[in-house]
């Protein structure tokens, strides 16, 4: 019994109306094919084409946005310009100026280590030195 109903439905042809029925009754609304959004928009077509080409070539879509790539490119260019300017400045200096700069750098390096050692000293030693200074100042004031 159930199989007979299925056979009858198969004979009907499903939900779609056959073309001869559409032509026979002019009051029926003829179905229209839906527009593909990729084909409808020019920008979608170009984007889709570009993605397909990149996929075929094996190129992945960049994970970085365009703005970030531009900023990195500018930073890279700025660093290159800066290095070129430094090299040009070194080339333009005469040997006498270069020797003066070397000596100045050596003197700066010799002065820096004592400052660093003071910074690494424990806190109680710094406080003790401050207390000694205060004590010597007060004793000098008493003498005067």
Curated annotation (Swiss-Prot):
Q: Which UniProt keywords apply?
A: Actin-binding, Cell cycle, Cell junction, Cell membrane, Cell projection, Coiled coil, Cytoplasm, Cytoskeleton, Growth regulation, Membrane, Nucleus, Stress response, Synapse
Coiled coil ranges:
67-94
Q: Where in the cell is it found?
A: Nucleus; Cytoplasm, Cytoskeleton, Stress fiber; Cell junction, Focal adhesion; Cell projection, Ruffle membrane
One GO biological-process annotation of the entry reads:
actin filament bundle assembly
**The keyword Protein biosynthesis belongs to this UniProt entry's keyword annotation:** no
Q: Is the Zinc-finger keyword given for this protein? A: no
Q: Which InterPro entries match?
A: FAM107
Task: Give the top-rank taxon of the lineage listed in the UniProt record for this protein.
Answer: Eukaryota
Principal localization reads nucleus
Which terms in the GO cellular component ontology are assigned? cytoplasm; focal adhesion; neuron projection; nucleus; ruffle membrane; stress fiber; synapse
* Primary role: Stress-inducible actin-binding protein that plays a role in synaptic and cognitive functions by modulating actin filamentous (F-actin) dynamics. Mediates polymerization of globular actin to F-actin. Also binds to, stabilizes and bundles F-actin. Involved in synaptic function by regulating neurite outgrowth in an actin-dependent manner and for the acquisition of hippocampus-dependent cognitive function, such as learning and long-term memory.
Q: Quaternary form?
A: Interacts with ACTB. Interacts with COMMD1; this interaction stabilizes COMMD1 in the nucleus. Interacts with MAP1A. Interacts with PRDX1. Interacts with F-actin.
Family, similarity comment: Belongs to the FAM107 family.
Q: What is the official name of this protein in its record?
A: Actin-associated protein FAM107A
In the record, what lineage is assigned to the organism producing the protein?
A: Eukaryota, Metazoa, Chordata, Craniata, Vertebrata
């Amino acid at each position: 019994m159930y199989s007979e109903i299925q056979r009858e439905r198969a004979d009907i042809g499903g939900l779609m109306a056959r073309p001869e029925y559409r032509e026979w009754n002019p009051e029926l609304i003829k179905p229209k094919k839906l527009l593909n959004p990729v084909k409808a928009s020019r920008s979608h077509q170009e984007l889709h084409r570009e993605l397909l080409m990149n996929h075929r070539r094996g190129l992945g879509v960049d994970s970085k946005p365009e703005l970030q790539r531009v900023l990195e490119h500018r930073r890279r260019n700025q660093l290159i310009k800066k290095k070129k300017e430094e090299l040009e400045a070194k080339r333009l200096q005469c040997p006498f100026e270069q020797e003066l700069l070397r000596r100045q750098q050596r003197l700066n390096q010799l002065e820096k280590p004592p400052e660093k050692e003071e910074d690494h000293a424990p806190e109680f030693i710094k406080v003790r030195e401050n207390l000694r200074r205060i004590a010597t100042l007060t004793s000098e004031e008493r003498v005067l």
